[in-house]
Amino acid sequence: MAKGSKGLRASSKAVDPTLDALFASSAGPVQAPAKSKYSTLLDQKVREPAKPKVHLEEDDEVLSEISEELSFEEDGPSDEDEDEDEDEENSEQEDGSGDEQEEEESEDVDETMKDAPVELDDIIDATEDKSNKERKRKRKNDNDDLEGKYLDKVAAEEEADRAGKRQKNDALTKTEKPAVDEEDAGNESDIPVHETLVKDSKASDLDKAARTVFLANVSTEAISSKSAKKTLMAHLSSVLEKDATPPQTIESLRFRSVAFAGGSLPKRAAYITKSLMDSTTKSANAYVVYSTTAAARTAATKLNGTQVLDRHLRVDSVAHPSPTDHRRCVFVGNLGFVDDETVLNTNAEGDTTEKKKNKTPSDIEEGLWRTFSTQGKVENVRVVRDSKTRVGKGFAYVQFYDANDVEAALLLDGKKFPPMLPRKLRVTRAKDPRKTALAQERARGKHISTNGPKSTKYKHKATPEEQSMAGRTSKLLGRSAAVQQRHKKRPSAHGESREAEGQPAGIKGPEQFVFEGRRASARDGLPKDLKQKKGKGKKSGRPQNHGTKRASEWKKKKN
């Protein structure tokens, strides 16, 4: 053993003393780092603080592009990561085998020095790749399902809007039917409906007209005062039956023919501001719509001539108005144009003076009601006014229920009844409108041509012979005669027709009369038994014909 040990150990003389001093102070051969030292570095991950999530409100196209890029990045590194994991496992296995070899083979110093740096570089590369992978995965987590989050946010906002609309429409949905979508409504309108089920607008208008009542001489206080309007409504509903089925009520009340003060102001604005012109007239017209036709008929019969707000009401049905009978009417003229006839005079200096014709303003319509009611029961009073300004035209018509009351009303002619009727009345019988129309046509006929359609001059009536010849003249007398008879033109000697001369075609002049019989002569006055001596008349010459002319010419040539 001692000999063997001596043989293996180098002699002290063979070792260089300088090298011995160098290696004596060194730490020894380079050893591979332990596995546990780098495994701790791999396990420790650098955790960056999480970035705040930002809700990007971008278009759907931008979001889809981002999602495609993210998916592309996820697909790319995944294969590389798998390869890196395999490399790490292989490197770990190699490290384990390397440690065992280092313990067993400590003598191979050069090989370990070559292998150690290679293994260290692989481990460093693996840690860098893993850190990059973790960063990519963090980016992926931050932008994960970005488009879905955006759509969820939009859906939440729409749901909030719908909830707000539902809260607003809760009150309406309780009383009304649920709203129908536009598409459903359009589909329903396209569905054909039988003509018997379709509501006719004309029929509805006729039904409403049957339930409407016309009111005249309504006080304008009902327009300007709410209490006066309530009084009028109570009076109009006083004749309705409370226990009727269906119930009888007043649906609407509309005022018409109102004299407004503002000339340039629209009628609706003037009605809202209650700017009325009482100086023109204190009355207006109105229309009342009842719920049933029976209620309208009852109101028209019972309320006519009644008093409300110190005025007599004229009530008439719109669908079936009362007839106008001239035998029961009187014409009243010389009435005032406006109720308040105050005259304003302005001097040259600009001073304005008022001159009132009457201390108390007149009231024409109500005055006629009260004045003629003393002579009989008045059915209606119609004062003719201008449709726009409501200024009267100075006359009116008063109709009674009984025609005998007209005689008593005629006694009021030439009388005045202040303060409502301050002027003297001109009362006459009302004329038949048909006779008046005929008289107007006659007056117009004077200015119309003789053969005009409304001419009042004599027109020839065709005789039976002419009637029998009608239609056969062209066959019997020729086409020209038929044309003359059709146009009733008889040419005169001068070539002008009788119509052009101003005489009707059916009347003949004195020169056109022809009496049948022989022509009159001087012998008509002599007695028949008287014989007169016949004197020799002049001898008639030879006939002058073609033969005599030739003979005379031949004789002249011969001589």
Curated annotation (Swiss-Prot):
User: Could you tell me which residue ranges the RRM domain spans?
Assistant: 211-320, 328-432
Query: PROSITE patterns, from UniProt?
Result: RRM (PS50102)
Annotated Basic and acidic residues bias: 44-56, 141-180, 516-532, 550-559
One of this protein's Pfam families, by short name? RRM_1
**Keywords, ordered alphabetically:** Nucleus, Repeat, Ribosome biogenesis, RNA-binding, rRNA processing
- Record family assignment: Belongs to the RRM RBM34 family.
| Record protein name field | Nucleolar protein 12
Q: Which organism is it from?
A: Gibberella zeae (strain ATCC MYA-4620 / CBS 123657 / FGSC 9075 / NRRL 31084 / PH-1) (Wheat head blight fungus)
